[in-house]
Amino acid sequence: MSGLTVSIRGRNGAFAIEAGFAAEGGVTALFGHSGAGKTTLLKMIAGTLRPENGRIAVGDFTLFDAQKGINLPPEKRRIGYVFQDARLFAYMSVKRNLTYARWAGHRPATRSFDEVVALLGIGHLLDRRPSTLSGGERQRVAIGRALLSDPALLLLDEPLSSLDHARRQEILPFIERLRDESHVPIVYVSHEIDEVARLADQIVLLSAGRVTASGAAADIFPLIDAESEGGGVLLEGIVSAYDERYKLAEIDLGGASFQLSDAGLKQTMHVRLRVRARDVSIARKIPEAISIRNLLPVTVTGIERGEGPNAHVFLDFRGRRLGARLTRRSVDDLGLSVGDQVVALVKAVSVDRAAIREK
């Protein structure tokens, strides 16, 4: 088994969908606004909705092939499905919910019960009923049940959408552990940018039933930012130095570097940085006596002016893309044009803590 390959066309009532992408492993996020076709696509992968033509496969395991007449029923696809609501058996204990999944899978176990329980931190919940669990706990149990069915692929359909912010923060580290330790490809449906930034290895953008872009998270994430105040770019790096006196970490981005204050970082840690366009300003030259630590020499690669007061300036920083959201007045006052060499002032950098990995 390996990654997921999808190339299909079909309909869900009057809604038409045409999707093609390949995901090598890790977490593939299906991202788009409500009604973009994310759940419809997930149903076609799961086998509860039949495409009109095309092919779906996990590695060399074919789930659907219209040309060859293959359309495996859902129970034969080796897919674990986690919904927005946990859908646990209310009359069963947590332990029985989990062991039922193993029985229903009808396959030899590749993961032990204890391994899955430890991975998701649910050992203390085994004797309880679903009605006594918090929303985050129920979703962790639902993920455990899906994992114990020995899936070749996990489909998570907005699993955090019914949870408040605190519960989301509670469960995200467990989904990250699942990504890093289970070795099962995951398709993760969401319209929350923060979740995608934190979890995704690959991103598939959907709009009106069509894939508009797909690829590595760092490459696709800037496309989300063009439409949202909350987006930005993702930069992968390694902590190359740490100043104990000032609690400043230096992040090596492959020839370039960032400085940020974070007492939890240590040398050799791999981290994912998120730089939002709203946190980037532009100057014609390096300012004197300024508190901002990250002053980066960049090249203007594009300017997108909206009808409102703002403009988006696309920047290149040693082969890495950045963006700055400025007012149109600022763009005109600076006289910016494509090809200009300017300085990006990065006012804030966030570290996606789940993306921190010690090597």
Swiss-Prot record:
Its EC number is 7.3.2.5. Residues 289-355 form the Mop domain. Residues 1-233 form the ABC transporter domain. This is Molybdenum import ATP-binding protein ModC. The complex is composed of two ATP-binding proteins (ModC), two transmembrane proteins (ModB) and a solute-binding protein (ModA). Gene3D superfamilies: 2.40.50.100, P-loop containing nucleotide triphosphate hydrolases. One of its GO terms (cellular component) is plasma membrane. It comes from Brucella abortus (strain 2308). Its main location: membrane. Coiled coil: none annotated. It is a peripheral membrane protein. It is found in: Cell inner membrane. InterPro entries: AAA+_ATPase, ABC_transporter-like_ATP-bd, ABC_transporter-like_CS, Mo/tungstate-bd_C_term_dom, ModC_ABC_ATP-bd, Molybdenum_import_ModC, Mop_domain, P-loop_NTPase.
